[in-house]
Amino acid sequence: MKVVVRAPFYPTESLEKVLSSIFNLFDAPKESCAVVGEGKGRYIECVFHNHKPLEKFRRLLRQQRILDAARSYVERGLREGEVKFYLNKQAAFAGKVSFCTYEAGESPLGSIIVVIELGKCSPDEFLNWLAPRTVNGKPVGEVSELKCLEQGSG
């Protein structure tokens, strides 16, 4: 599994604040991130070769009780072997998960873009791990561990 988290980084923004927006949602070592590009085309990109950074994000979805909304946005972003979704950068700075429908327009300073290459994980297994369906607010069919990662895909 490979996880890429990317956020635009404008000249008027503080590097530390943009990094905080990412680290508030994803458990990640700072060394995994780099500034890419120049001027208005600059962005911060964090690349991880396992699912560990997603564990904090997964916890936040449960704490905020937004599993159904999260599942809907993540399902919408499912493509051939990968998932792509957008998060509001300002909400992330405050430690809150807020999904955006589009990459631009909903988050004034740009969205945080998350791309997950599923590797050997099936979309259903991944969805049921990250954001299972709920009934009366309780997760149903939840996968507690991604078994597909035990097969050596990280």
From Swiss-Prot:
Transmembrane segments: none
Source organism superkingdom: Archaea
Gene3D superfamilies (alphabetical): 3.30.1440.10
Family, as annotated: Belongs to the UPF0201 family.
Name of protein: UPF0201 protein Tpen_0695
